[in-house]
Amino acid sequence: MNAPPALLRSVLFAPGNRADLIAKLPRSAPDAVVIDLEDAVPGTAEAKAAARPVAHDAARDLIAAAPHLAVFVRVNALHSPYFEDDLSVLTPELSGVVVPKLEMGAEARQVAQMLQERSLPLPILAGLETGAGVWNAREIMEVPEVAWAYFGAEDYTTDLGGKRTPGGLEVLYARSQVALAARLTGVAALDIVVTALNDPETFRADAEQGRALGYSGKLCIHPAQVALAHEYFGPTEADRARARALLDAAAAAAQRGHGAFSFEGQMVDEPMLAKARTLLSHEA
């Protein structure tokens, strides 16, 4: 298996029927890429069937050409007529499989079992994109094979019969619930797609909100979004330097027998130290 890094700040998608675009995925230096057999491929049996060998071969070539890159395939939803045939595209060399529109923990367990039966012990990136999926987010993420989850705002809003607005108030509750469930289960949460492709300020504002809600990375649908995602997700070198200095100060205080100490004008407590340790753990 091509193991993904501990932190996925950016996950860049490409259509599974476009080998030319898949080959270009590493150019923008995302942390992970997804070869998409679901939304990016027309919803006909003929189109899905034609995309599978393209996606399979493109994934193989991408893994060989960019061994540092985490490569995923997104299959169609479990209860779609395409799901089982999509499994033929998967190989053990992938970093994981993206399963959209999961709605119950039992569905995630069923997917994991089907993968195991095919000798494909791949971790799952679970898509929570419906009212039921958000409602049952925690039980889905408690399935051991689920390592990451993403919130899909567009499908969620459609499922509820709502409407997307520039401010995103209509998805704030669900977006927060997915982030909370991820925190409680130790799963990494990936934030929503920004469909405005030529509007970096809109992307930045959305990424800033996602980071504030607790998301650790962002789904990207254009190469230009990758660098923007990296601005907001994951520690900067300044963040790392400050964390190291804080832990050094804590060690020095402990040597002096001081349980409490201040750092840069702030009293330090254990949650601050834990946050610094977590930040530096992503360097591994």
UniProtKB/Swiss-Prot annotation:
Query: Which InterPro entries is this protein grouped with?
Result: Aldolase/citrate-lyase_domain (IPR005000), Citrate_lyase_beta/mcl1/mcl2 (IPR011206), Pyrv/PenolPyrv_kinase-like_dom (IPR015813), Pyrv_kinase-like_dom_sf (IPR040442)
**Required cofactors, per record?**
Mg(2+)
**Where on this chain does substrate bind?**
74, 129
What are the recorded Gene Ontology BP terms? oxaloacetate metabolic process
Q: Which domain of life is it from?
A: Bacteria
Q: Where does Mg(2+) bind?
A: 129, 155
Q: Which EC number(s) does the record attach to this protein? A: 4.1.-.-
The note on the cofactor says: Binds 1 Mg(2+) ion per subunit.
* A single GO molecular function term of this UniProt record: magnesium ion binding
The answer to keyword NAD applying to this record is no
The protein's UniProt keywords, in alphabetical order, are: Lyase, Magnesium, Metal-binding
The UniProt family comment states: Belongs to the HpcH/HpaI aldolase family. Citrate lyase beta subunit-like subfamily.
- Known role: May play a role in fatty acid biosynthesis.
Subunit structure and binding partners: Homotrimer.
Q: What is this protein called?
A: Citrate lyase subunit beta-like protein
- Which species is listed as the source? Deinococcus radiodurans (strain ATCC 13939 / DSM 20539 / JCM 16871 / CCUG 27074 / LMG 4051 / NBRC 15346 / NCIMB 9279 / VKM B-1422 / R1)
